[in-house]
């Protein structure tokens, strides 16, 4: 199956990089410090900015300090961070197809995790610091499309989480979901779904999928 597109906009954590062990370990330590149920905190965490996640559980006057604490815990190491299947190969074979990263991580987290996973950063990267609102708001994907000079409707967004899928659709893009972190039924809003990026190959006019 061929998905024609003028540009590809990649989510990072859960799509290209697996940092689950680090994120869960940090979240559980943080939740214990702040008296929050760690399972509740993690339940809707994936694909969202840290500050937005924290704001769901703490009053506004504590969000900045608590966000900084969680960021610090997540920056304590890179153990267990790996590239997800097919990610390195797909990026190496983009063959001039314009692409960008749009992530809910801040720049420091992005560089730490992609570096540990061996994922090279493209020239255009949109992080949590670059947008007024995080996913599911479409701001990040709209910014990335603008920087690439491509109409959002001509972009293919690749995501692994419901919040990111909602952001891609709200931007007007076609959304491809990978089944790396969520069950298929929770990603039903995506236009297309594949197991992982090992089933995707780049071509000058878009991406080829092996379903």
For the regions a protein language model found, what residue spans apply to each?
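Short, surface-exposed connector motifs at secondary-structure boundaries
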Residues: 92-98, 151-152
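Residue-level detector of anion-binding/catalytic polar loops
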Residues: 37, 98-100, 174
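Residue-level marker of regulatory loop/turn positions in helix-turn-helix DNA-binding domains and
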Residues: 83, 102, 133
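Hydrophobic residues in well-ordered beta-strands that form the structural core
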Residues: 18, 101-103, 177
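N-terminal helical cap/lid subdomain that shapes the substrate entry/recognition surface
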Residues: 2-95, 106-107, 119-120
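Asp-based, Mg2+/Mn2+-dependent phosphohydrolase catalytic module
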Residues: 1-6, 106-211
């Amino acid at each position: 199956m061929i998905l024609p597109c003028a540009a590809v906009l990649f989510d990072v954590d859960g799509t290209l990089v697996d940092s689950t062990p680090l994120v869960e370990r940090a979240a559980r330590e943080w939740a214990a410090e702040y008296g929050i149920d760690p399972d509740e905190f993690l339940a809707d965490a994936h694909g969202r900015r840290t500050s937005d996640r924290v704001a769901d559980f703490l009053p506004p006057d504590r969000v900045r300090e608590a966000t900084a604490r969680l960021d610090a815990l997540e920056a304590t190491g890179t153990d267990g961070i790996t590239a997800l299947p097919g990610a390195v190969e797909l990026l190496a074979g983009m063959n001039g197809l314009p692409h960008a990263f749009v992530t809910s991580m801040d720049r420091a987290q992005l560089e730490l995790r992609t570096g540990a996973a061996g994922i090279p950063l493209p020239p255009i990267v949109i992080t949590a610091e670059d947008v007024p609102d995080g996913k599911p708001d479409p701001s990040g994907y709209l910014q990335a499309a603008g920087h690439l000079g491509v109409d959002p409707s001509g972009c293919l967004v690749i995501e692994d989480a419901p919040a990111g899928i909602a952001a891609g659709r709200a931007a007007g893009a076609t959304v491809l979901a990978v089944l790396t972190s969520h069950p298929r039924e929770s990603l039903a809003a995506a236009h297309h779904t594949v197991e992982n990026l090992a089933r995707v190959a780049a071509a000058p006019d878009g991406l080829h999928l092996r379903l």
